[in-house]
Amino acid sequence: MDTIRVSKEVPGSSKSTAQSLTESTSRTETINGSHEFKISGYSLVKGMGIGKYVASDTFMVGGYSWAIYFYPDGKSPEDNSVYVSLFIALASEGADVRALFELTLVDQSGNERHKVHSHFGRTLESGPYTLKYRGSMWGYKRFFKRSLLESSDYLKDNGLLVRCCVGVVKSRTEGPRCYNIPVPVSGLGQQFGKLLESGKGADVTFEVDGETFPAHKLVLAARSAVFRAQLFGPLRSENTNCIIIEDVQAPIFKMLLHFIYWDEMPDMQDLIGTDLKWASTLVAQHLLAAADRYALERLRTICESKLCEGISINTVATTLALAEQHHCFQLKAACLKFIALPENLKAVMETDGFDYLKESCPSLLSELLEYVARLSEHSLTSSGHRKELFADGCDLNGRRVKQRLH
């Protein structure tokens, strides 16, 4: 469908005054339809004479009536019945009907080697075909050589199958809509969030680091499979009205509840204040671990994205360890790529986070070494030698090694 936008300015308006602007849109598209015409008893219609035809029943496309005409002895005397002719004709009253056509002689062997003549799917130099009046035709006088047709897979059980597609071109102009009823955005998250803030109807309380957090069992169960099992599953605790959380810190649990109810990340400063120990990366790391524990996949992905954006020399090692522990493969790949860069490797190895990485995930060191080696193989100097990624003389465990000469 082609679209043309037209803007009109009121004449006589000056630059110093506000201009009145109106808009309209012209839309041109095709109304498509198809018809299958089966010709049985081909041997009986052959020989009926040049210019004689068999016609399909009429069919409607785009508000107009159409028919398929098959000439078994051809349409033109000059062809001397060497070719069969095939046409599509306008069968209803109409003037200057513009349309696209496709005529197909179907291969009845199942090999899909149809003979197709089509306007569709290609650029036409003069645009769609125009039929001026009832009886106007489009097609081919020499559609197929008759001798070849009679020995082909198009003829089966003394019958032919013709398929015709018609696309009638229609245009319309749309002006601005006079009436509009705005639909407000969903307030579901805000409504549940207000429910959390009010505490009304709360039927479970969580105790975290000496703080209490009231919540609603059904909301938690709907959002988290882990909470659903903990609150309503066969292995649920005897006391589901008060649950002690020991491995998640209070600010993180507060953010977790906020996401469950609001379905969006909270403002970190509003929830955790200005405590410097809760840097944004550290918050995202703890929140990712909590999201993984309670099977909140969307929150987990949000945390992965934030950690990926915040990768730096000082944070990448601990983030890599976290990604390994919680199977965050995309985040892990981003961390490995960052560390393996020659300008980053030495600095990362000198951080406390790298010491933590060696202790918590020693298997990652060999994986990192392989990654660096692969990168090294693709990093060649102009002389054809490898660049030395360990020019500082350290291995991945921080030990001094003898530098190689090139």
UniProtKB/Swiss-Prot annotation:
Q: In which tissues is it expressed?
A: Ubiquitous.
Indicate, by first and last residue, each region the UniProt record lists as having compositional bias (Polar residues). Answer: 13-29
Q: Which UniProt keywords apply?
A: Nucleus, Ubl conjugation pathway
Among CDD domains, the record links this protein to:
BACK_AtBPM-like, BTB_POZ_BPM_plant, MATH
The biological processes this protein is annotated with in GO are: cellular response to salt stress; cellular response to water deprivation; protein ubiquitination; response to osmotic stress
Listed as disulfide-bonded, the cysteine pairs are none
Could you name the domain of life of the organism this protein comes from? Eukaryota
Task: Read off the PROSITE patterns from this record.
Answer: BTB, MATH
The record's subcellular location field reads: Nucleus
User: What pathway is this protein a component of?
Assistant: Protein modification; protein ubiquitination
Q: Where is this region: Disordered?
A: 1-29
Q: What is its main location?
A: nucleus
**Which parts of the sequence belong to the BTB domain?**
202-269
| Annotated domain remarks | The BTB/POZ domain mediates the interaction with some component of ubiquitin ligase complexes.
Subunit structure, interactors included: Interacts with RAP2-4. Interacts with CUL3A. Binds to MYB56 at the promoter of FLOWERING LOCUS T (FT).
Q: Would you tell me the protein name for this molecule?
A: BTB/POZ and MATH domain-containing protein 2
Q: Please name the gene that encodes this protein.
A: BPM2
